[in-house]
Structures are given as C-alpha cells and as structure tokens.
Amino acid sequence: AYHETFEGTYIVARETGNKAALSTYVNNSAVIGSSYDAIKVVKMVGHLPFFAGLKGDKALVIGFGIGVTSSAIASHTQIKRIDCIELVDGLKDVAHYYKGLNADIQYDPRVNIIAGDGRHFLLNTREKYHLISSDPTHPVLGSGNLYTRDYFELCKQRLAPGGMVSQYLPLHKLRQQDFSGIIKTFHSVFPDATVWL
C-alpha cells in the first residue's frame, strides 16, 4: 500500500525474503515491521508498566504507529481510555494490515486517535494520565525532541498521582554516548526509573 499525505509518504510492503513479514516506511525510512524482533519490543513497551504495578485506567500513547503498543495496553482490562497521538495521521488507516498483531485496536471504543505532534499535545492538554507510553520513531529519524529533559518534564506534568511513563529507546543506530545521555536524562526526571533491555 502506498499513500501520500500532507505529513509525508508512507508505504506498507512485504519484507524482502520473508513473504509473511510486513514493514511500514514513512518518508522512505523503515519505522516498524511485523518481524518477531520488532513486535516483541513494542509490545513490551505497552506491557511493562502493568507488570510493574500500574494503577489507574487512563493512558496516553505518543506514537500510535501501527497500534501494537496501544493494543498491548488495551489488553489490560483496567484501561478504560487510551488517547493516541500520531504525527503521521494516515498510519491509522494502514493499521488494519497488522490486525493479527494489533487486534484492530483502531476500532476499539476506548481508543481516541489524535493527529498531531506528541510534544505539542502535552504542552496544550490539561488531561492527567495514569500511563504515558512514549513510542516514537528512532531519534535519528527526526523525533529527537521526544528524548529530551524538556519532553520528559512535560510527561511528568501530565501524570496522574502514582502514574508511570514507559519510554521506548532503540539500541540500533544510536551511539553509546547518546544512549547513555538519554538514559541519564530520563533518570534525572524519573529517579525511580528502571531500564529493561
């Protein structure tokens, strides 16, 4: 599937050499695929807060993508509402290609998909969330402002009492000092944070 929109060009294609696996590209950069390695990570981002004892029923997902993280969060029945922010609005329209992985989450009545920038949303909303799951694209693909102290502070301001932030951070294509710097920055805002690899 090929689509051009104001936000950019996005493509869903079969992975070379693996007819069963799909990849989604935004502006010619692979952002997510259906391979086991890709999916286990985004599912983990959604599930870990619950394993850590998350209480509450309202979640915010920054980076809806193909909906797998949102689907993982929705699988926990305590969740009554999930607001999902996605910069490339059209991605929700191709999420159905991944329905075996996301349980058609885009049609779940608890889910509200909002087109826009995650940081801008946090600046302008007054909502408080029990979980903020930040699952942006790789920082080298233009989402670097979603890995900064300013962004983490915004997340903290939008947490309900006892709330948690789950932050995706890739290991690939990231220099050691950049990876360490992001971890230190996150930990400076959330001193009780744990890192899962």
Language-model region placement:
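Basic, ligand-binding patches in group-transfer machinery
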Residues: A1-I32, Y36-I39
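A general structural signal for short secondary-structure junctions and capping/turn motifs
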Residues: Y2-E4, A13-E15, A52, I73-A74, ...
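A Trp-anchored, charged/polar loop motif used as the substrate-binding/catalytic surface
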Residues: E7-Y10, G116, A193
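Ordered hydrophobic segments in well-structured contexts
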Residues: I11, S23, M164, T194-V195
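The AdoMet/dcAdoMet-binding core of the Class I SAM-like
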Residues: S34-I183
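Conserved S-adenosyl-L-methionine
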Residues: H187-L197
